Amino acid sequence: MAPPKHVIIIGAGAGGTATAARLAREGIKVTVVEKNNFGGGRCSLINHNGHRFDQGPSLYLMPKLFEEAFEALDEKIEDHVELLRCHNNYKVHFDDGDKIQLSSDLSRMKPEMERIEGPDGFLRFLDFMKESHTHYEGGVEMAIKQNFETIWKLIRLQYVPALFRLHIFDFVYSRAAKYFKTKKMRMAFTFQSMYMGMSPYDSPAVYNLLQYTEFAEGIWYPKGGFNTVIQKLENIATEKFGARFIYEAPVAKINTDDKGKKVTGVTLQSGEVIEADAVVCNADLVYAYHNLLPPCRWTTNTLAEKKLTSSSISFYWSLKRVVPELDVHNIFLAEAFKESFDEIFTDHKMPSELSFYVNLPSRIDPTAAPPGKDSMIVLVPIGHMKSKTNEAEDYTMIVKRARKMVLEVLERRLGLTNFIDLVEHEEVNDPSIWQKKFNLWRGSILGLSHDVLQVLWFRPSTQDSTGRYKNLFFVGASTHPGTGVPIVLAGSKLTSDQVCDHFGVKVRPSAITSSKRTYAPEDSKSFIWDIIWFLLIALFAATLVLFIAFPQYSEVNQTAASYINNLLPAAFRVPVANLSLTS
């Protein structure tokens, strides 16, 4: 009997851990190498004197995708993780002192919507939710659960109606503006694009699906912190399926055999070489192509030009007492809403007026802080680093300015004084720290951006995008399907299925039955007809462009039609008189 295939996974983040568990379940030997002495990547914890902070994600959204990640391992998530539902979604604070409580309880939303939007405000809110539901259902099934390995998968005619239903070519803010009359509600229902690290003015409207999942499925919190989910996946991978995790093992390079068009394993910074039949990279994709692989034109030209998401200054404050004015999730929005996003995403700097997010996990999970105290996280979105080094930015001064601005807003909008006196201890992540700690390219906390030309087939592939290495795969925020923990977990299925297919391993069906929907298998005849139709449409479009762009072939007084006509064999030419410019 042949020995099992060996796969090395670089990085023990959400994607790497879930992929390790999936592959190990299929009998593949899996070794995970992680640079840090902890797992989870950005889904890791900071602890200090009884205070616990989620270093990265704190909003447990799209719960079905989490359930599916555990079901694929023949497990139920409720047997491993205790989920706590937030009574309120957010408390949103505006610059004029007004605030609104967003809740998935419609009986509470109705008076809030009518107070700000007028008598028909609640009905327009329901219409917005109806459209967002379409985005959610279509977006998950088409964009998240499908792997666009070739352009042919993208151009299938069955997807054309979906592109319009999902408003791919419209933007989050402009769609919200069709339903909400007031600036306050437009802001309250578009700031969620920051979960994708994007401006609502540039983010494809399909990402309004985030608002739907918040209201329809609720916002949850895993007891013990977000890292609990990843830790449980690791436990399943190691204890149930025999995967191996090695910590404090940073990778120096991915070893390659260019003649054989394959990778052969990794070399650790310690000098140790670990051989493998395939490598899955869960390290930041842009970092990996620039630092772990030989240079190539695609990396230096194509990848280097792709847009990045924002970074953040994140404060982790241990508070002396509970602050009752704050809820679990709090949003403070700048009056100069659009201008602040322009400064983040166009100028790549900290905005002059801050919008920021405040999370108090201790409000929903008392184990996050000592009795009578709060653990408080403040996330301030700012532009990513302008270069690989932080030479252009003085983050010591930028952090100092951000702290001062946050405190001023908190005190003014909450009616408090000397808020800084409540802070017993502070830890900070700025863009340079995000880059150093997690190898995030230019400190971009959510990887590559998700504009129209950086999603689906246009996003870096789950299999080596350069075409050089047939056994090199990727999982994580910057590859398809995209960023966010639930989306990355869904992506782990696409990647692991691809690896199994590469080895000729058939994925066993889950022992856990689920009602989740899946697309029907591809019909090969339908696929061929899609290609034929695409070629015909492309030919028609090319001809139309010629007729519009080149109305006259001036040297011989010909039209574009007559010029093309002359290129045809004589038997196929149209009589010249029918194509003449003059009567």
Swiss-Prot record:
Its EC number is 1.3.99.30. GO terms for biological process: carotenoid biosynthetic process. InterPro entries: Amino_oxidase, Carotenoid/retinoid_OxRdtase, FAD/NAD-bd_sf, Phytoene_DH_bac_CS. It holds the Pfam family Amino_oxidase. Pathway: Carotenoid biosynthesis; lycopene biosynthesis. One of its GO terms (cellular component) is membrane. It catalyses: 15-cis-phytoene + 5 A = all-trans-3,4-didehydrolycopene + 5 AH2. GO terms for molecular function: oxidoreductase activity, acting on the CH-CH group of donors. PROSITE patterns: PHYTOENE_DH. It is found in: Membrane. It is a single-pass membrane protein. The chain crosses the membrane at residues 531-551. It is an enzyme of class 1 (oxidoreductase). Residues 1-20 form the signal peptide. Keywords: Carotenoid biosynthesis, Membrane, NAD, Oxidoreductase, Signal, Transmembrane, Transmembrane helix. Its cofactor is NAD(+). NCBIfam families: crtI_fam. Belongs to the carotenoid/retinoid oxidoreductase family. Phytoene desaturase involved in the carotenoid biosynthesis pathway. Converts phytoene into 3,4-didehydrolycopene via the intermediary of phytofluene, zeta-carotene, neurosporene and lycopene, by introducing up to five double bonds into phytoene. This is Phytoene desaturase. It comes from Phycomyces blakesleeanus (strain ATCC 8743b / DSM 1359 / FGSC 10004 / NBRC 33097 / NRRL 1555). The lineage of its organism: Eukaryota, Fungi, Fungi incertae sedis, Mucoromycota, Mucoromycotina. The gene is carB.
